[in-house]
Amino acid sequence: MSSVSLVASAELPTPWGVFTMTGFKEEATGKDHVALSMGDITTDAPVLARIHSECLTGDALFSLRCDCGFQLQAALQRIAKEERGVLLYVRQEGRGIGLLNKIHAYHLQDQGADTVEANEALGFAPDLRDYTICADMLKLLDVKSLRLMTNNPRKIKAMEKYGIPVAERVPLEEGKNAYNEFYLATKAGKLGHMLHD
């Protein structure tokens, strides 16, 4: 049984082109998730894809504390350039701890904690995201395999585990700046992200 149900689809014009926006409802939590796709993603050729966890601060409020907003825009631009691909926008704010807890974590980071230490000080694991819903979204969209834009090895392992082969990892290093250098170093050093700078 799928962890999500497909609810509706509509066109979504963006600065990079017109995507198809597909809405999903997560059965266990009632959360809404979205896929933005372009072109025919149902063929056997691996699909350029991004699994993007919601980040209100980076995606909508232009925060420089993370690389999320930069990655979101770059992923949509790359999909539009290829005229084929899919981006999953998954409602797992703050690596799954939620917006208000993320603000608490930011406060601890302002005091010197890194992103992992801040989550742990609040009683959370460093990363609470569940990628089962992503695999189920892709299956409902009839996506067979991915060229996954990610620096996170957990996403690759999760897709493979849940039956979505990853033919290629496409690096997505965007938006490094003075405000997020420590954050990116922690992602590489403590969370195993594949970053080169």
UniProtKB/Swiss-Prot annotation:
Molecular function (Gene Ontology), one example: zinc ion binding
InterPro entries xref list: GTP_cyclohydro_II, RibA, RibA-like_sf
A GO CC term attached to the entry: cytosol
Pfam families listed in its UniProt record: GTP_cyclohydro2
Gene Ontology process terms (BP): riboflavin biosynthetic process
Binding site residues for GTP: 50-54, 71, 93-95, 115, 150, 155
Catalytic activity: GTP + 4 H2O = 2,5-diamino-6-hydroxy-4-(5-phosphoribosylamino)-pyrimidine + formate + 2 phosphate + 3 H(+)
Keywords for this protein: GTP-binding, Hydrolase, Metal-binding, Nucleotide-binding, Riboflavin biosynthesis, Zinc
Pathway linked to the protein: Cofactor biosynthesis; riboflavin biosynthesis; 5-amino-6-(D-ribitylamino)uracil from GTP: step 1/4
EC number: 3.5.4.25
Regions annotated as coiled coil: none
Cofactor note: Binds 1 zinc ion per subunit.
Residues of the active site: 127, 129
Residue positions binding Zn(2+): 55, 66, 68
Cofactor(s), by name: Zn(2+)
Domain of life according to the entry: Bacteria
Free-text function comment from the UniProt entry: Catalyzes the conversion of GTP to 2,5-diamino-6-ribosylamino-4(3H)-pyrimidinone 5'-phosphate (DARP), formate and pyrophosphate.
Family per similarity comment: Belongs to the GTP cyclohydrolase II family.
Alphabetical list of NCBIfam families matching this protein: PRK00393.1, ribA
PANTHER family: 3,4-DIHYDROXY-2-BUTANONE 4-PHOSPHATE SYNTHASE, GTP CYCLOHYDROLASE II-RELATED
Descriptive protein name: GTP cyclohydrolase-2
Organism encoding this protein: Tolumonas auensis (strain DSM 9187 / NBRC 110442 / TA 4)
